Amino acid sequence: MDIIKALAKELDKQEEHVSNVVTLLDEGNTVPFIARYRKEMHGTMDDQTIRTLADRLQYLRNLEERKKEVLSSIEAQGKLTEELRARIESAETLAAVEDEYRPFKQKRRTRATIAREKGLEPLALLLFAQEKDCPAPEEAAKEYIDEEKGVSSVEEALAGAGDIIAENISDDAAVRGALRDYAMKCGDVCSEAAKKDPEDTVYRNYYKFTCAVKSIPSHRVLALNRGEKEGVLKVWVEVPHDNALELIFRRVVKKPACASTAFVKAAAEDAFDRLIEPSLEREVRAALTETASEGAIGQFALNLRPLLMQPPVKGFVTMGLDPGYRMGCKVAVVDGTGKVLDTAVVYPTHGERQKAEAIRTLSALIKKHQVKHIAIGNGTASRETEQMTVELIASLGKGAGVSYAIVNEAGASVYSASKLAAAEFPEYDVNLRSAVSIARRLQDPLAELVKIDPKSIGVGQYQHDMPEKRLSEALDGVVEDCVNAVGVDVNTASAPLLARVSGLNAGVAANVVKYREENGRFTSRKQILKVPKLGAKAFEQCAGFLRVPESKEVLDNTAVHPESYAAAQKLLSLCGYTEEDVRRGNLGHLMERLHGYGEERAAQACGVGLPTLFDVCAELKRPGRDPRDELPAPVLRTDVMEIKDLKPGMELKGTVRNVIDFGAFVDIGVHQDGLVHISEISDRF
C-alpha cells in the first residue's frame, strides 16, 4: 500500500503536502509548529487536520507492519500463494488482514482439529468439492470407519467431516467479510432488562429496545454498553438468520444437484450458528463501540476547546467563591495577576444571621482590595451563594461597579488536592485552594485549566467509558493546540502552562521557571536558549509560541518566529514602516501598502511564501494579540433570575455548557441549564 497516496485520498489533500507533513512529523516537529510555521509545505492544513493525518499515518504503518508479520508467518508454513499475498497486500484494514490470516493461525484443539487427527479431512474435501460423481455422504463415509483412529460409525465420520467443513467455511475471509458487511447493513442491536421485574432506572428506555446497526446513534451504543456493564441490561446483535445462510450458500454451494450439497449446507449452517455468529456479534459491537467512542472523544474535544479558549478577564482584582453547605463558602481574593491577597470562610446557608455576617465579611474584603469581579463556582450551594452575591452587590451601591459570573468548577477539587496545588499553596487549606482556582478561572481560564487533567473537567458524554489512552491523547492535543494558539508569556507562565508549549515538556518547563527565579525575567527570546536542556531543536519548536513583552525586540512579543524576523523587517521596510511604528500601533495602512507593492513580489523579496507573509502582517498589525479576545466574553451579571421569571418569546444571552448528540445545554442564569434540541439547531439530525 502506498501510504502517502492512501492518506491524500482519504483527507482530500495533495500527495506532495501529505508527504511533507509525514516528513516533518518523522523529523520530530510538533503539530502546532507544523501548522503555524510550515504552511507553505502543507497547503495551510490546520492543527486538527494534521493530528488526524498523524493518527491515520500511525494506523496505516501498523497495518503494513502487521501485513509483513502475517506474510512471514504464512510463508514459513509453506502455504503462501501469490493470490493470497496479493489479497493481504491490498487489504485496507486490520480486520481484513486478520480474516486472511485466520486459517493459518495456531489454533487451540477444536472439533475440526480432532476430526483431522482421525484422518477425516479427505472425506471433508471430497464432500465439499461437490463433484458430479460424488457419492452420497453415507456411502463415502464408509471408507473412513477406523476403530483404531476412533471412528466407529458412518455417523461419527460424517460428524467429523462436517466439523472440518464448518471450520473451513468459518475461516474463509470472503465469507466473513461478506457477513460482516451484511451485519453492519442489515443487523439490529437489541436489548432487554437483565432481570424479570426490573426497577425504574435511567435505562428504562432500553428494557425492550431494537435499533438498526447502521443507524444507531453513538450515545445509545454507549448507554447500552454501560447498562450491560452495570448488570441492568442484556444486549445482543441480531442478524437475519435465513438471509445470512443464503449469503453463505451462494459462496459454498457449487452444484445444487450434487449428492453432497445438502450435507455442505448443513455444515454451513453449523458454521454460522456455532462459529461465525458469536464472533460476528463481538466484531459488530466492537466496531460500534469504537465508532461511538471516537465520536464521543471528538465531542469531548469539541466541548473542551471553547472552555479553554474563553476570553480572559485580566487585570482586575477578583474574588473566588467556592460554595458549600456544611463546610461553608470558601473565599479567595486575587490581584490582577492571580496572586492571592486574602482568604476567608463564610456560612451564608446557615441561617439569616450567618448570611448577614457573610455579606459584611465579603463587603469588607471587596472594599479593602477594590474587588471588581466575583467568580462563583457552579457546584453544590451555588444557587444560594449566587443569591447572597446579588444581595451583596446591591448593598455596595450602584457606584461600586462590581459584577459576578458563574464559573464551571469541574476539576477544581481535583486540582486543590494535587501535588501541584500543594506546592503552589502549601500554607492554604485544600478548600481555599479551590476558591483561588475558581477566581483564576475567570481571570485566565486557559492558564488555570492546564493544571488539571482534561478528563476531570467533565465536558464530555460517557467520558469515563472511553479508552483512557486514546481519550488522553485527544484531549492533550486540544490543550496543546489552544495553548500554542494563544501563546505564553515566558516571564509569568506557570510550569504546567509552559509544559504544554510546543517543543517543551514538564522537565524543561521546570527548568525555565527555575532559570527565571535565579536570573530574573527574560529580556529576549534568544535568552531562552540559556535554559538547561533546552537545545536548538526545542528552541525552534517553542520560540514562536513564547512571548517576551519586556524585550527590546518588538517581534519577541508576537507570534512571528525568529526565523522570519529578517522577513518581517524587510516587509516593514518595503512598506515604509519601522519597528517603532509596530510598537506604537501605526500600521493601519500596512495591507494597503502591501497590496500596492504586490503580495507575490513582496513575498519573493522577503524570502517567504504568501501564507507566512500574511501571518507576519497580521502579527505586525496587532503585536501581542490574543485570539480569545475575538470570542464572546463571559456573561457578567449583577442580578439573578428565576425560572418563574422566564416567559415565552424572551431572548436571553447564555453560555453553552455542553454539546451532546441530541443538542446543547445552555446556562441562561436560572440555575438549570436549558436544552436547545438538535431540531432547533440543524436541518438534518
For each predicted feature, which ranges?
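Generic start-of-chain signal for non-secretory N-termini
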Residues: M1-S19, D26
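Accessory alpha-helical DNA-binding modules that contact the DNA backbone or grooves
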Residues: T30-V31, H42, D46-E148, A485-E630, ...
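Residue-level signature of catalytic and energy-coupling elements of molecular machines
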Residues: I34, G119, D322, I374, ...
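Duplex nucleic acid-engaging cores and interfaces of nucleic-acid transaction enzymes
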Residues: T49-T52, Y59, L63-G320, G324-Y428, ...
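OB-fold/S1-family RNA-binding modules
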Residues: D242, A271-S279, V402-D489, S494, ...
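Short, acidic/hydrophobic/Gly-rich beta-strand patch recurrent on exposed beta strands
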Residues: A332-V334, F665-V670, L675-S679
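Short, conserved beta-turn/loop elements at beta-strand boundaries and strand-helix junctions
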Residues: V659-A664
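Short, intrinsically disordered, charge-balanced linker/junction segments flanking boundaries
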Residues: S679-F685
